[in-house]
A protein has these predicted regions:
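Noncatalytic, solvent-exposed loop/strand surfaces
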Residues: 1-165
Length: 165
């Protein structure tokens, strides 16, 4: 089953095949069955990564990279144009992730079902900067509305914005 949403970024269409399946970057103009034969490519496939698909979260593209979060808390970074993997790192042992990651100001944010927001530095090397607890279950992907980030937990709605200086 495939739940993550397809999306376009920097001239390519990104498709997630689902948990344990492949991740694909498709070139514009593709028509028909684009499924590559095992170990092969085709004229419409920019790149693919076997066993890099996820069950629930949709990947996020940011600053030339594709960040893929598994529902078990493994964050992977791929070059958006070539598909080359920079890293694959676990955020938290035993963690469960339903919401999709988001990116802002040089950081990648991943919200666990336990309500912990993992803040990772965007870049080729994995660097966990902070873990911010909300102390409540969270399953929905946060929404960005104007200058605010809205995070819904089991019983609360948080509205977060930068301090005005």
């Amino acid at each position: 089953m495939t739940i993550p949403s397809p999306f376009a970024y920097d001239g390519l269409l990104y498709l997630n095949g689902g948990r344990g399946k492949s991740l694909f970057a498709i070139k514009p103009g593709a028509i028909g069955d684009l499924t590559p034969k095992e170990g092969k490519t085709n004229e419409f496939l920019a790149w693919s990564q076997e066993r890099s698909g996820t069950y629930l979260p949709t990947q996020v593209a940011y600053d030339g990279a594709l960040y893929v979060l598994s529902d078990t808390g493994i964050l992977s970074r791929f070059d958006a144009k070539t598909g080359a993997m920079s890293y694959r790192s676990r955020l938290e042992a035993g963690g469960a992730f339903t919401s999709s990651p988001w990116a802002y100001n040089g950081r990648i944010f991943c919200l666990s079902e336990e309500g912990k927001t993992f803040v990772v530095k965007a870049g080729e090397k994995f660097e966990l900067l902070h873990v911010n607890p909300l102390d409540e279950m969270a399953q929905a992907t946060p929404a960005i509305v104007a200058d605010r980030l809205l995070i819904r937990t089991e019983t609360r709605l948080f509205s977060i914005r930068e301090k005005v200086r």
